[in-house]
Regions:
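Conserved catalytic cores of very large enzyme subunits
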Residues: 1-306
Length: 306
């Protein structure tokens, strides 16, 4: 009954996957299976860590992946701030194929992560130097032994993760572009951009096309493949910018931490049919609200592919 209400409750977690992830993530630090099984109440939203031996206060930034689709559409220009944020790569109108547009997106993503990692290092350093949590650090294994607070990487299984949100909005938008502009040719770039610039007001017919394009969460192979490809490319490019703040291998955790609300006013209308100002999609691999229409089993199958 609760699931059917569509409220996003209760939360479903695959604990076998969480244990396996901890074993891989902390393998170089000698984690045991028993330790990996001592998962606490979830760190943050859907993050995982080791109870009494891990910390989750240091972040590598919170990128808005849906915004990167905007940068790809407008060649590094931000319609919200009216500033050229990233170097020009290639105008969307000059991309003869979806693959050309996708390649441009990845290049903008590379610029974004380069800037973000520098900013997050500065923020983490400031937190460590100015507001270290000494009391809590004393309660975590490893801090006293190493003489380091949790902000400095003292816990035995410390981690500094990139909270990656709005990935489903980005994937749905990319598929809508592929479907409507390149595959079926129902729209041109000029038509789509006019509708987006107007926040779909007066272009409700185009919004209907965008909203009706196949979406993540319905067990549609092509959509699921693109969603998975996008997430893997995000991780690959993020990790290419070096280790995390503590010097360990960089990792991501896709979830929202409510940033899907914060990002809403600064993210324009998107090709997935969403209007500017409307909250982006919550959680990690949940469907865009109102678009998972093939039942809960289809949603779970799509989520497992992402």
């Amino acid at each position: 009954e609760v699931v059917r209400s569509g409220s996003g409750q209760p939360q479903f977690m695959n604990m076998n996957a969480a244990v396996a992830r901890s074993l891989v993530r902390f393998a170089s630090r000698g984690i045991t299976l028993d330790e990996a099984r001592t998962l606490p109440v979830i760190f943050g939203c859907v993050g995982t860590g080791i109870q009494g031996k891990g910390s989750y206060v240091t972040f590598e930034g919170q990128p808005n992946l849906a915004k990167l689709v905007e940068f790809a559409m407008y060649d590094g220009y931000d319609p919200h701030t009216r500033k050229q944020v990233f170097p020009n790569v290639k105008p969307a109108e000059e991309c003869a194929t979806f693959e050309e547009l996708y390649d441009a997106l990845l290049r903008h993503m590379d610029h974004a992560y380069d800037a973000q990692r520098k900013i997050s290092d500065l923020g983490n350093s400031t937190r460590e130097q100015i507001v270290p949590n000494i009391f809590r650090s004393c309660l975590l294994d490893g801090c006293i032994e190493s003489g380091l607070c949790e902000e400095a990487g003292g816990p035995k299984y410390s981690q500094s993760l990139c909270i990656t949100s709005t990935g489903i909005d980005a994937a749905n938008s990319l598929y809508a572009i592929k479907h409507l502009i390149y595959d079926t040719k129902q729209l041109t770039w000029e038509q789509l951009k006019k509708a987006l610039a107007a926040n779909f007001e007066g272009y409700e017919d185009i919004q209907k096309l965008c909203f009706g394009a196949p979406k993540h969460g319905n067990d549609i192979e092509d959509v699921d493949q693109l969603t998975r490809r996008f997430f893997r490319d995000v991780e690959r490019i993020y990790r290419s910018h070096g280790p995390d703040y503590f010097g360990y291998e960089a990792h991501m955790d896709p979830f929202s931490l409510s940033y899907h609300n914060y990002f809403a006013p600064m993210t324009g209308a998107l090709p997935n049919g969403r209007q500017k100002g409307v909250a982006l999609t919550d959680a990690s691999v949940s469907a865009m609200p109102g678009t998972d229409v093939n039942g809960s089993t289809a949603l779970i199958k799509s989520a497992a592919q992402a």
